[in-house]
Amino acid sequence: MQFKPLLTASALALALGTGAPAFAQAPAANVAASTADAAPAELSTLVDQVDIPYEKFTLENGLDVIVHTDRKAPIVAVAVWYNVGSKDEPKGKSGFAHLFEHLMFNGSENAPEDYFQYLQEMGATDYNGTTNFDRTNYFQTVPTPALERALWLESDRMGYLLGAVTQEKLDNQRGVVQNEKRQGDNQPGGLVFYEIIKALFPAPHPYDHTPIGSMADLDSASMEDVRNWFRDKYGPNNATVVLAGDVSADEARPLVEKYFGPIARGPVNEPAQAEVTELTEDVRTVMRDQVAAVSIDKYWTAPGITDRELTALTVGAQILGGLSSSRLDNTLVRDEQLAVSVSAGNYAWQRVGILNVSATARPDVDEAEVERRLDELVAQFIAEGPTEDEVRRAATSTVAGTIRGLEQVGGFGGKAVTLASGEVLADDPSFYARQFEILATLTPGEVQAAMQRWMTRPSFTLVLEPGERDGSYEEAAGVAEAAGDGDPAEEVTVTKVRPAPPIDSVAELDFPEVQHTTLANGMALHYAQRDAIPATYVTLSFDAGSTADPADKRGLEGLALGLFEEGTTTMSSREIAETSERLGANISLGGGADRSSFTLSALSANLVPSLELLSDIVRNPAFAQSEIDRVRAQRITGVEQELRTPSAIAARTISPLIYGAESPYAGPDTGTVASLNAITREDITGFKDRWIRPDNGAVFVVSDRPLAEIEAALNGVLGDWQAPAVAKGTKSFDAAPAAPAESRIVLVNRPNSPQSYIYGGQLTSVDPRGETYVDFLNANNALGGNFLARLNMNLRETKGWSYGVRGAPLTNENAVAYTVRAPVQADRTGDALAELIRETGEFLDTRGVTEAELTRIVTAEIGELPGQFETSGAILGAMQTNAMYGRPDDYYERVADRYRAQTAESLDAAARAAIDPDRFVWVIVGDASVVEPQLEQLGLAVERVEMAGTE
């Protein structure tokens, strides 16, 4: 039940300079020349690897069914797409398509409970629903024996929903959606998307409103609207079912006909037609909000996804501002250093699209100069066009990303989504193949012609400046009304009894065999083979992480890691980016509190040159002072943005209160403005020498290539890498805070916030290596760990005060904290916190895990295992986790038996030994003028602090 705008201004993504792990020093191996000279695989060869064969059939009632067979795992993705979205909403009913999507999860006539309950019983993974302008989709990936149950469930809500929809459910989900809207609006830049849509698609254009809708229109939604929408829009002849995974068309057809065939055809739905608008003149708007830096965004309307020029526009946008080596990146960020970030993109929907270019100015630079240069560079690109090399690099990056994504059968972007989106939006499941055919032969002239046609028209410029928010925020009319206290629950009306089919035994997880060897320089190599896609994933993991930061140099690890790709002793940052794009490789740096990691995702056809590039980045970073200053400025802007973002404010505030200010886990891991400014080049090179070195790391690989080939390739680039003479770094976790005598509240005042962000936590004595750790995790699955857990069901599904609540252990190598997070509407902050305290206290005292909860949780955890490890990335992550905690390689195969042995009593004992309900620290980020009087009624000490501008 997720709505995500496809486009936001750059200010919404100011989490700049994300920390990246670093590699240690070695002799400057001469890898740059061979990498740059290596001939990558031909683009046509890569395109040929993107193939999703399918069979399609149509039932008599008009339901289209597409089946793709993929036997790599005993799972099937089930996707149901309806050809209706927010563009089809009548005037005065904005947001209704998305609100109706929520109601589809609240039970149908023969499955009247919350939909997620049935999904967990099946062991489903990757389940959700989304709404955009053009379509509404529902999806889940289930174990193969649960496929029939999933089809029964989806068909019941397609054909037999209305008898289960009540006024109480409508009112509740209205509140949930309005809190989803508040949650988005409450973010810095959260009102920008409304302004973009209003400017580019003025009423009465079908795209003149966002899918989330307006508060007033959501207030007006009625049961009659629900009935009409379902009858008019949700017939089988307006839907497509896609099955992708461990199933054939011959196996699927009888099941689909059995469950969907009897559903009557509905009215013929004619999706709204929409012309691509054109502004009569350039339009400019200035907005202010709690952002750290000025962003300048320019927007042009563009054609929809079926237009022949779509691919050319997308590639052009990548070259201009999407690639790491983009024109805007090279000039505005690297060379002239006028901007801390840039972007460009082509965001296409079914009927229309939006082209966007963006630059976020360095705080010390005149924004007018940034905009002037942005305009000049766009004009220059349109006039000159791209080079052949730029087009090939953009195309290769696109194809490589697609190959990696198609390892997954379902979820938000797997094979089922690819086939369904093509069918529903372009009337062709193979639409992706048509686009790739164009991509494989695309010329610079075609890209230039498309950009000249669409980007020389009048544009909309939106400048977002730091300051007090001046956009209009809309509140719901019934914000102060109680939810969940209305009339008694209405009875479900069953128009046709449809018994649920049984679920056969789910296959046990078959985790790949992990093999171990040692490279020539002594680094451990952990390897598993997966041949679902022609790709190789390599992680170099080092025992560092943000806990390696000195107390007075917080953010050092993140700043250092952010510099490894910004130039080596033989390659510039631009050359690194261009080489990576030619190879279709992706190198990411990160890790977390305890590890720093460098992860390469490579096309196996380009494995050796990709490894050469990775090795050069890890072993030979230049750490040029100019690059340090540039990346430091980016990271400082990121910190300043964190200090304006509710969730980040809460996290930065609570960490030292949980772990103790002296603990390495206290953070903030991104640092402060002062600590980042204090870091020198010597600090950065010292970090690399102490932590990013072969005697402090290990290599993890998942590949379709055999171990012998992988080992030889790694020895070729890492085998001669030796540790420097300086001593390895050490960490100390001796500092531990005294447990608080009682719970307390810290209120961070963030004026004019429509929501409050509640973040509670405490340090536990849980050992992640201990026998009771899994019991603790599943106890939390009853209390706060998933959608059906008590905290979420109370505040979201019963009260309607929040879009989502979660309780979760924050597990690090040397400390485990328990946390609760709940964004809630501002006027219910006190009530919501009181409910969180009550639910947690009762769970840890008189209302522990029930037998029904135990059965549901254990069934779900066992059933989900095959789906959890569908991808190479998931296998790679599990291998690293097992290594860090000293677990056996087959840990995830064994854990099912551990689940089966659990009892309600064992889960209760683990939770009660770990959590003390009377010793929570509760951080609340919200408008103190609204929130503080509510909190004073709870009987806890309240400390009020003002939101920091800088630290």
Stretches with model-predicted labels:
Residues M1-Q25:
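Gram-negative bacterial Sec-dependent N-terminal signal peptides
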Residues D217-S222, V226, L676-I679, I684:
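Alpha-helical scaffold elements lining the catalytic groove of polysaccharide deacetylases
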Residues Q167, R174, R227-Y259, P458-S459, ...:
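Non-catalytic, conformational "gating/processing" segments within enzyme and secreted inhibitor domains
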Residues F23-I66, S248-R288, S295, Y299, ...:
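Proteolytic maturation boundary segments
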Residues D156-V165, Y259-P267, D375-P386, I617-F623, ...:
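A common structural junction motif
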Residues I66-H68, A73-K91, G95-L99, E113-Y160, ...:
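M16 family metallopeptidases and their MPP-like homologs
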Residues V176-G184, E275-D289, A395-L406, A602, ...:
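Short, conserved secondary-structure transition motifs
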